[in-house]
Amino acid sequence: MKMKKSKFILVPLLLFALILNTIPAFAASSESAAVAQDAEGRKLNTVTITFKPSGLTKGVATVYASASGNVEYIKIKITLQEYDSSSGKYVNSPGPSYSSYAPNKSSLYYTHTFDLSAFKTYRIKVDVTSSGDGVTQTETLYQSLS
């Protein structure tokens, strides 16, 4: 008999607790909800990076990026970096960065071959930028030569 009474009280208490947990979800302002929806609606979906050796003195960097939503442009910028043993950090190598820009596209594939020294340690720094509805999103990623 005690078991039935405790179930009779426990079930309404659990339902009440569930209802209390959902109240804060409805308390968000419509403005913050609209901003969150916009940021979620237009975002970088996929960024794939490879940096592979090609012979002894070349490295091939390949980047694929895609974004969803209302995309005005997508841009990839690749910067070669080399390890500086005196500072223990990677620094930008002498020479330019290489970029590709695609207006009104939601994806972009870009590849570039870098000249390398056999006696240095390299990686690439990749900046991927997408823009839409006046909001710009940039991700910076790194890939070591492998």
Give, region by region, the residue ranges found by the protein language model.
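Short beta-strand elements
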Residues: 134-146
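Short, surface-exposed binding/anchoring microloops in extracellular/periplasmic proteins
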Residues: 41-80
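Short, solvent-exposed, Trp/other aromatic-anchored flexible loops in extracytoplasmic proteins
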Residues: 97-125
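Sec-dependent signal peptide cleavage junction
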Residues: 20-37
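Short beta-strand segments and strand-loop junctions that repeat across beta-rich extracellular domains
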Residues: 77-89, 125
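Bacterial N-terminal signal peptides
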Residues: 12-21
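Bacterial N-terminal signal peptides that target proteins for export
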Residues: 2-11
